[in-house]
Amino acid sequence: MVQARDSKWVLREPSDPEKVDRLATEVGIDKVLADLLIKRGVETFAQARSFFRPSLDNLHDPFLMKDMDVAVERLHRAVVSGESILVYGDYDVDGTTAVALLYSFVRRFTDKVDFYIPDRYDEGYGVSFKGIDYAVESGAGLIVTLDCGIKAIDKVEYAASKGIDMIICDHHLPEDSLPAAVAVLDPKREDCHYPFDDLSGCGVGFKLVQAYSARYGVPFETLVPLLDLLVVSIASDLVSMVGENRILAHFGLKQLNENPCTGLQAMINLSSLEPGHVSIDDIVFKIGPRINAAGRMETGRLAVELLTSRSLSEAMQIGEKINESNNERKNIDREITQEALDMVQTGNCLCNGSAMIVYNPEWNKGVVGIVASRLVEAYYKPTVVLTKSNGFVSGSARSISGFDLYGAIESCADLLENFGGHVYAAGLTLREENLPEFARRMDEYISAKIETEMMTPVIEVDSKLNFACITPKFFRILKQFQPFGPGNHNPVFLTENVYDAGTGRKVGAGGVHMKLDLIQEDQPYHQISSIAFNMAEHYDHIKEGNPFDICYSIVENYYRGNSSIQLRIKDLREREDICGI
């Protein structure tokens, strides 16, 4: 694949030395680690204790969320009266885990509960008229939507006309008007003063469950087994790993590693992961894509069936199907990505200025979001990938750091049939005759708003570090910064003037990666294992014994039951290329 332009390394300003010294002394840690804590807003011993020891006692009161009282009361009325409940969610990981979580909880109290996942190709994203018709046919009196519904004004009206109440649980940005549902739970509502507004869709569903349990005497500890579903949502939907999300993810990972639900146990087995050592990265790169593949290639209903399965044998059968879908998805993804790259390189795309817009009516709608991400990796500019589905042009958009692509799409709302999403990722649908004007206006808007420096990927370096500092104790404390994610990334370090110890080799299909044992000149016996993905173009320079600089994160590598410290190199510069940082 074509590589994005060279990254700019930006070394963050060190924290106040007095604060660093004080915190390092109080907590008994290395100054580098104290500096990292202060950069995360942790400046006192008490704050450090809370950071290193997340507690479920620190979760916010769910009744601080607007409409929670009425939502809980309406759900309880349905449960005790034997009214049929339909749990409705999006087909992606966040939606299917949310549906699995709420469905699993509600079925503890009633068997009058069903779930519905819209078909990506037939119905598209969000609440559909077909889904409401399903609720009518199945006799449901209450629909609870998860990870969707905040814009479903007409669908809520239609449901009401059929005698069906709706509770909306969403985390997307609402428009000026809200649906006239019984309750609208969304921490991003302007009139909602919930203290944390970056919950995932599944997170909003969990707050409903938490509130229901508190109101009606369900012990909180019985909710802990649901947290493995929630951490999969938090990691896969890339919400911030701070505040309440970090607490929930911490205990969700614990549940996932110690006693996962049968569906996630099947995913762990099929992903060839080390039981008991599943990380956020494993969710993002192994488990999440497999669950997503169900909705991309077949039906998201399969994912919920997997995640609510009560027997491992059944879960493994469903998991095998999903695994096959994921393999098919990867093949199609590769083919379409190459076709899209060819279109860009031959100038055969709708737009390739400040933005990139490519369109092929034959592409599989289920993978266009992935392809958009690949193009951003390759060219580092806001990208829209479009195909044709059900007579409309539809697709996905992905942005670069610092640029609000959702705002650009919103500026073309008059040309669109539907759109939704976040600042950095969105989906849209439009009529084919509007495509040229959409491309023109998107490019015009983005050209006017984007800043030149945004077009160069930036690697933020937290601190310079000598290899001598990377001791078992240092790494043991660093691990307690987990779980990592947006807002609490795995720290990035810079070490200058390093060498390969002589054992470096190319690895991976086609030899595009490198496995190196690194040393610094003044510490030739202190070797550290490292992995550099897609950087084999530097291999000759390194094998000739030349020095280079690296920025990297420190990770724990598990292999055949053994663990070791490994550097995951994010970028590498040959010494003659260094112009200072």
Where are these regions (language model features)?
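Cofactor-/ligand-binding subdomain signature composed of acidic, glycine-rich
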Residues: 1-81, 232, 286-321
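Divalent metal-coordination and catalytic microenvironments
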Residues: 37, 90-92, 144, 170, ...
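Acidic, two-metal ion nucleic-acid-processing modules in DNA metabolism proteins
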Residues: 107, 112, 136, 246-343, ...
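N-terminal small/polar loop signature for handling phosphorylated ligands or for N-terminal nucleophile
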Residues: 66-179, 184-185, 335, 339, ...
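Flexible, glycine/threonine-enriched loop-and-boundary segments that flank and lead into catalytic domains
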Residues: 346-372
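Gly-rich Lys/Arg/Thr-decorated short loops/hinges at beta-loop-alpha junctions or inter-strand turns
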Residues: 48-59, 83, 108-117, 187-189, ...
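Functional cores that coordinate and move charged inorganic groups
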Residues: 137-140, 148, 153-296, 300-309, ...
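Short glycine-cluster motifs
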Residues: 384-399
